Amino acid sequence: MTKQTGRLTLPTDADIVEETIRLKNLLGADALRDCDGTEMPDALLNEPVKKYATYYTTRKDNAWAEQNPEEIQQEYLISNRVTARSEKLCIRLMEGFHTQQLKVNTLDDPKRWWEVIDRTTGEVVSVDDWEFKKEREEVEIKTIPYHEYTVSFLAFLIWDPVHMYNFITNDWKDTPHQLTYDVRQPKTQKYVKEKLKRWCEENPQIDVVRFTTFFHQFTLTFDDKKREKFVEWFGYSASVSPVSYTHLRAHETSAH
């Protein structure tokens, strides 16, 4: 009886090379792949099967992100609801969020891109009635006593959410936090295209490229205790920015 192979892909890692080969032969796997946070071991590159390689379009290049901090990926956050007890209220923006994952965007004008809402009346508070205190990362609001208020604001994703999830779940210790970058931004878009082309040319042994971590797929936002605070598996919550909003509005205007 002829031994059949195919339709089975085995994940692998650097410390299970021999076991991977044994299972490949035993189960008749026709492909091997690396996993998130790992790379295909060199010892497996000559195995007579297809090779799948994970490729990250929006992370795993901290040098680029550090050189272009204004093009790091962003998302909108909403502060805690806070009740005013006088005619002035200060809301701490990052309270309840993990500061290793998120950083307040102080580069773009808060009065243009943020919103303060009186949750008791449902009305948007005039930009003349609040100020952002950059050094304290607080918003100071002229308030009506005993009304509830929130602030919606932009924050940079300074730790990729999927990498953070894997870091916490797998209890990684010494792995550097991976920064994000936004492929809609002009410099990053050009850089990412050139980098992908170069990677394909330098890795002819790879048969299938597994693209992963697209920010339009899901959102993972963690609280200050590294617990999942907000999770959305189908949406665009973590792929917003002034640039993307401006492009969207321009497209809507031209469509009409």
Residue spans for each PLM region:
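Short secondary-structure boundary/capping segments
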Residues: 48, 69-70, 223-232
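Short catalytic/ligand-binding loop motif for oxyanion handling, primarily in non-cytosolic enzymes
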Residues: 60-64, 216-221
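Mature N-terminal, pre-catalytic/accessory segment of carbohydrate-active enzymes
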Residues: 1-198, 202-206
